[in-house]
């Protein structure tokens, strides 16, 4: 159970008091909790604080008060921790109990690639007996939304744990056993010592407290628009006006009654404009003058402008260091939740790329494989013709039906069904990482979100790597996972769905997979906004850093959050025009390849760029409407003189979006985080770790009146959030500079030099910069540099003293049902004042947007680093360095940095107890040389190779696509996933059996060949295995055998949704062809039966007279007419046969398999949709056709009294 743990026993200390103060603005949540724990043991112990973090939160501050000690944390570069004797080394253990070959030192725990994202772990040192510990922790989070547009605030369980009705165990006893059932991921060992404690178990336990505790809760709401209501489904709440509120947009929520301790605390906010985009603004912590002086003291700015002091050069340097100066600039946040509830679901318009990953390892039993076969057949028949699909089986290696996802048509569907029918569990162990890498590196298809369906019954020993891989592609891929049997890894299955916003399903013994599969398919086929992008427009005098930069898709209830770090560069641009507009963003272009973001040339929209943008007034959004790329564009703002910042994260909506421009509280511009802003003396290192102590000057904090023994103040004037130790506390001195006692933060006078503590770097980093892009990787030392006294750096005398407000616009675009949609919202960004006002008060929440924006920017750099590393080993260093810079500057963790605990009173670092995975950051030259030495010389980075293997058991339709280390080119020129050594977990390395050209040619021939076989014959062969079984009648079938009653019929359905009227169809539904045709409402079908009989026997004169006297017509044309051709007659008969067979199939499903409607409802909906689009011949109507099919079973009851009549009113609109 998370919380404050005893290292020796793993037991959680009881919570005595919880005081939660939180703040919501738009979709952003700032939360600070004061948690007091009591040590009821008679013996001291080593304390460990464990705090779970969700996918959209980050820890931004931490302090712990233990008696007279204060423990905080500091962000450190993982690559430098070894050099600093912090004993943090790379690890390959992935959250399970450590393997024998990689032992963990006593008192150590491991975090794999996934756990370090979702767990915050801090060593608090020794806790004395009967001592209380108060922990202050601050987080910034992105809030989820509901389909109605409501914003959901759910308090973390660790801040408000439930209290069981009856607590029988004593305090201090060993922690309760985890609720999970996953022995593979969570282990079954007893936690008799801390070094054997598996932190993954903490995520699977319910957070409880053995007794009631004092609970306080306060939520301040600052909405971008008026609130339509605030409610809590769990508690009675009270709403009061905030003391500083200027309108009804700001209120304070508290609990009206005492907390009951039996449920979580949940608050729902209902905005008055729930489905309109809003832009909110949070100012930086520097004025224009302060930032000017800040720049003049930076080494990269001095070097960059030493030879070239032009305005263009200055703005270029500012642009390259924007990620380092995020706290100093204003941050804009875009919030948007589209209204998809009003979109009428249309299964036939369900677009997507459906990829099925099936575990075919030897652990799959014969029963499980048969269950998967039937479920996969139903799933494939439930897909719509507009989508793409592929099937991949994996074990030690993996095999795919197609080289890439193919369009859903008859030929591809028949081939896939044939492969599924012959699928067996014969592929060895379980290697999930390689097939996932192969899938995720495939190019995305426009308008088709990638939907991954993964079925497994086991576990892997690299769970962290698998989850982190899917997390990195969560913007483009959504995973629906299925766990079969008791041995499945619960953490793996749940994690895959959680990190990608999918869903997880588990099957116990005896359960059916089809209902759960169809349930997930229906979620995936819901209305979706794909290819969502955001385009920002700013004046020419503005530099911006934008996130996100990748396309995404939004399903019902999901929201979009975009960020922009905006820098006013008007002081550095001569003769600038505030009305001139340009577009720029963080995309890959050729224009500023060395910059952290990539501006485009000054340009406006072309006349044919679309008519989506209408006239926009200040502070008003426009209606969402389709865009026509061939129509002219008219903007209220001069677009030809604007600059656009693109973020390839789009969105589309269907409702009007008028709203007034909103910004965050203008009083929130004072300095934040006194602890972080206070400059601290360098920490001196000694050779012996146990005796290392660092002299730290905390007089600054004491002078400012902060009582460290009491912790931060959370309420009233002067309230503050806990913080991190400043980055000025370095382990090494720079050059031979003697340590100095840094004074308190002071206002800078004009001409004074300034060095930002978060940007302080060691001189060692300057020596290892890549030579190809020095300006991007310049890192400052802690040595204060005198600014260059140059008159050219003064502001233009012609410029006005008070800059005008920055007017910008955000354009949100996306695709919905192949229709392009767009919204736009304008906003006003007031520039920072030239002089800081004296009346501004501190705001403890004034960095929330900055934290979330920094987190988003860090993730972008991490993704870019991984992408570059796939292309060439070591080429990703520039993005790793940028991620570390941003992490340290904003006190937001990244995968390349780690939290290190610091005991301020003892003036020393606490021993870290966490063993981190190898992040790959800042690889040394020796490591690079060693890794490059393993590859072929002169051929660059090893790439992935597409291979073909002979398949066993006649499974010739599955092609093996194994990722291999080979110096040859990749399949379809797609770069392979990150360079990694092949181990048993990821499949054994295999030798190439043929040269690259021959292998690629064979692959193209195999996959590129088209089937020219007859569709009816293929379908009959695909269902041969089902039809060969005896089909019991409905009245005679047992509950266990009824599961396959409808499977043979479903297997005959065409990709379009229709059924063919042939012998296979008649055999499946057990109705003779003669009876089907005689009961048909189409005279042509009945006449064809008569004609056939006449061909079989000699006709009598009476029969000839009867036929000639009343000849039936087919759409007004006689079957015996000489003008009608045989081809037209056959086509008409085939069309009528399809119509009749399809409605009969629907009636048969309703009659004979009503108990399984949940499983075949998508199949029936597709068939019904196909019928409704057809033109019914002979003047018949669709209702007549369906009624006749239902009456068929009434007639059959007279013909066969054993048939049970079970009419079900099926409505495809309910699907």
From Swiss-Prot:
Q: Which keywords accompany this UniProt record?
A: Glycoprotein, Phosphoprotein, Secreted, Signal
PROSITE patterns, per this entry? VIT, VWFA
Give a yes or no for keyword Phosphoprotein in this entry: yes
Q: Which SMART domains match?
A: VWA
Enumerate the subcellular locations listed in this protein's record, separating them with semicolons: Secreted
User: Which CDD domains does the record associate with it?
Assistant: vWA_interalpha_trypsin_inhibitor
Residues linked to a glycan: 132
Task: Report one GO cellular component.
Answer: extracellular region
Compositional bias, Polar residues, is annotated for: 608-621, 646-667, 964-975, 990-999, 1100-1112
Describe the location of the VIT domain by residue ranges. 19-141
Where in this protein does the record say Phosphotyrosine is found? 879
Ranges for the region named Disordered are 595-674, 934-953, 964-999, 1100-1121
Record domain VWFA: where: 353-532
Q: Which N-terminal residues, if any, form the signal peptide?
A: 1-18
| Name this protein carries in UniProt | von Willebrand factor A domain-containing protein 5B1
Its gene is: Vwa5b1
């Amino acid at each position: 159970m998370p919380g404050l743990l005893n290292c020796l026993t793993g037991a959680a200390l009881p919570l005595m008091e919880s005081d939660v103060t939180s703040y919501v603005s738009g979709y952003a949540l700032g939360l600070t909790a004061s948690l007091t724990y009591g040590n009821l043991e008679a013996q001291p112990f080593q304390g460990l604080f464990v705090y779970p973090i969700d996918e959209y939160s980050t820890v931004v501050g931490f302090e712990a008060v233990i008696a007279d000690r204060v423990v905080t944390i500091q962000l450190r570069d993982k690559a430098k921790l070894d050099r600093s004797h912090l004993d943090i080394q790379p690890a390959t253990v992935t959250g399970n109990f450590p393997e024998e070959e990689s032992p963990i030192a006593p008192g150590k725990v491991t975090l794999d690639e996934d756990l370090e994202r979702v767990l915050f772990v801090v060593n608090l040192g020794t806790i004395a007996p009967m001592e209380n510990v108060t922990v202050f922790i601050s987080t910034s989070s992105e809030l989820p939304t509901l389909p109605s547009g409501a914003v959901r605030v759910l308090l973390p369980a660790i801040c408000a744990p439930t209290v069981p009705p009856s607590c029988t165990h004593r305090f201090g006893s060993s922690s309760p056993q985890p609720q999970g059932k996953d022995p593979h991921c969570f282990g079954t060992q007893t936690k008799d010592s801390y070094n054997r404690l598996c932190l993954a178990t903490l995520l699977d336990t319910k957070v409880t407290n053995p007794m009631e505790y004092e609970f306080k809760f306060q939520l301040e709401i600052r909405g971008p628009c008026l609130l339509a209501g605030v409610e809590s489904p769990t508690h009675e709440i009270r709403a009061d006006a905030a003391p500083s509120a200027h309108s009804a947009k700001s209120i304070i929520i508290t609990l009206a009654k005492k907390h009951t301790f039996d449920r979580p605390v949940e608050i729902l906010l209902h905005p008055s404009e729930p489905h309109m985009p809003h832009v909110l603004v949070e100012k930086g912590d520097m004025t224009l003058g302060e930032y000017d002086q800040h720049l003049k003291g930076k080494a990269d700015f001095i070097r960059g402008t030493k030879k070239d002091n032009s305005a263009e050069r200055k703005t270029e340097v500012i642009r390259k260091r924007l990620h380092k100066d995020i706290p100093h600039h204003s941050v804009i946040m875009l919030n948007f939740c589209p209204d998809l509830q009003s979109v009428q679901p249309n299964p036939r318009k369900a677009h997507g790329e459906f990829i099925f990953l099936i575990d075919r390892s030897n652990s799959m039993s014969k029963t499980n494989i048969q269950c998967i076969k039937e479920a996969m057949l139903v799933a494939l028949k439930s897909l719509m013709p507009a989508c793409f699909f592929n099937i991949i089986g994996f074990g030690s290696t993996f095999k795919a039906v197609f080289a890439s996802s193919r369009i859903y048509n008859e030929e591809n569907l028949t081939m896939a069904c044939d492969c599924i029918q012959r699928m067996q569990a014969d592929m060895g162990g379980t290697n999930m990482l390689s097939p996932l890498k192969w899938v995720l590196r495939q190019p995305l298809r426009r308008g088709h979100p990638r939907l991954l369906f993964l079925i497994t019954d086991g576990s892997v020993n690299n769970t962290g790597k698998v989850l982190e891989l899917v997390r990195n592609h969560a913007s483009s891929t959504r995973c629906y996972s299925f766990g079969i049997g008791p041995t499945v890894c619960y953490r793996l299955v749940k994690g895959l769905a959680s990190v990608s916003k999918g869903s997880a399903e588990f099957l116990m013994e005896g359960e059916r997979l089809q209902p759960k599969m169809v349930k997930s398919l229906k979620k995936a086929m819901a209305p979706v906004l794909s290819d969502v992008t955001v385009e920002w427009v700013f004046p020419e005098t503005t530099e911006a850093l934008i996130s996100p930069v990748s396309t995404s898709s939004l399903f019902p209830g999901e929201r979009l959050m975009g960020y922009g770090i905006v820098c006013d560069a008007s002081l550095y641009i001569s003769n600038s025009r505030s009305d001139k507009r340009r577009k720029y963003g963080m995309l890959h272009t050729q224009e500023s390849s060395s910059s952290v973001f990539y501006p485009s040339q000054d340009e406006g929209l072309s006349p044919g760029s679309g008519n989506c943008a209408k006239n926009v007034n200040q502070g008003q959004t426009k209606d969402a409407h389709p865009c026509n790329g061939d129509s002219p564009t008219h903007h209220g703002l001069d677009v030809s003189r604007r600059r656009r910042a693109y973020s390839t994260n789009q969105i589309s909506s269907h409702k009007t979006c008028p709203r007034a421009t909103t910004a965050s509280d203008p009083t929130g511009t004072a300095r934040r985080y006194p602890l972080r802003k206070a400059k601290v003396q360098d920490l001196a290192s000694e050779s012996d770790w146990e005796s290392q102590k660092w002299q730290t000057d905390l007089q600054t904090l004491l002078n400012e009146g902060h009582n460290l023994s009491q912790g931060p103040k959370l309420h009233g004037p002067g309230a503050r959030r806990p913080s991190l130790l400043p980055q000025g506390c370095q382990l090494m001195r720079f050059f031979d500079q003697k340590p100095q006692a840094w004074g308190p933060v002071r206002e800078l006078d004009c001409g004074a030099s300034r060095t930002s503590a978060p940007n302080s770097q060691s001189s060692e980093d300057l020596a290892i910069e890549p030579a190809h892009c020095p300006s991007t990787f310049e890192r400052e030392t802690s040595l204060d540099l005198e600014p260059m006294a140059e008159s050219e750096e003064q502001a233009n005398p012609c410029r006005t003293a008070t800059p005008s407000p920055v007017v910008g616009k955000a354009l949100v675009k996306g695709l919905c049902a192949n229709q392009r949609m767009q919204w736009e919202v304008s906003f006003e960004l007031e520039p920072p004042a030239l002089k800081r006002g004296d009346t501004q008060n501190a705001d403890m929440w004034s960095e929330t947007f900055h934290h979330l924006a920094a987190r988003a920017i860090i993730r972008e750099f991490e993704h870019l680093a991984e992408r570059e590393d796939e292309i060439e080993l070591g080429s990703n260093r520039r993005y790793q360095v940028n991620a570390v810079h941003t992490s340290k500057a904003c006190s937001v963790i990244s995968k390349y940095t780690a939290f290190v605990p610091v005991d301020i009173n003892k003036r020393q670092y606490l021993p870290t107890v966490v063993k981190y995975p190898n992040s790959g950051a800042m690889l040394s030259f020796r490591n690079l040389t060693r890794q490059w030495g393993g590859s072929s010389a002169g051929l660059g980075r090893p790439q992935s190779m597409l291979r073909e293997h002979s398949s066993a058991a006649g499974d010739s339709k599955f092609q093996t696509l194994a990722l291999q280390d080979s110096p040859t080119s990749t399949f379809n020129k797609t770069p392979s996933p990150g360079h990694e050594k092949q181990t048993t977990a990821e499949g054994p390395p295999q030798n190439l059996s043929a040269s690259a050209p021959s292998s690629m040619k064979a692959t193209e021939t195999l996959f590129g060949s088209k089937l020219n076989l007859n569709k009816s014959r293929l379908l009959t062969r695909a269902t041969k295995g089902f039809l060969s079984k005896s089909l019991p009648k409905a009245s005679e079938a047992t509950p266990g055998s009824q599961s396959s009653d409808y499977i043979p019929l479903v297997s005959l359905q065409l990709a379009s949704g229709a059924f063919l009227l042939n012998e296979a169809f008649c055999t499946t539904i057990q109705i003779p062809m003669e009876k089907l045709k005689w009961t048909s409402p189409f005279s042509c079908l009945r006449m064809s039966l008569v004609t056939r009989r006449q061909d079989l026997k000699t006709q009598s004169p009476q029969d000839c007279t009867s036929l000639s006297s009343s000849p039936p017509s087919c759409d007004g044309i006689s079957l015996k007419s000489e003008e009608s051709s045989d081809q037209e007659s056959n086509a008409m008969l085939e069309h009528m046969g399809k119509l009749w067979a399809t409605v009969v199939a629907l009636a048969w499903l309703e009659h004979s398999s009503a108990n399984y409607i949940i499983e075949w409802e998508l199949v029936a909906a597709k068939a019904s949709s196909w019928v409704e689009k057809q033109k019914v011949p002979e003047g018949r109507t669709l209702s007549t056709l369906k009624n006749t099919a239902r009456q068929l079973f009434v007639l059959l009851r007279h013909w066969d009294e054993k048939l049970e009549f079970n009419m079900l009113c099926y409505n495809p609109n309910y699907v």
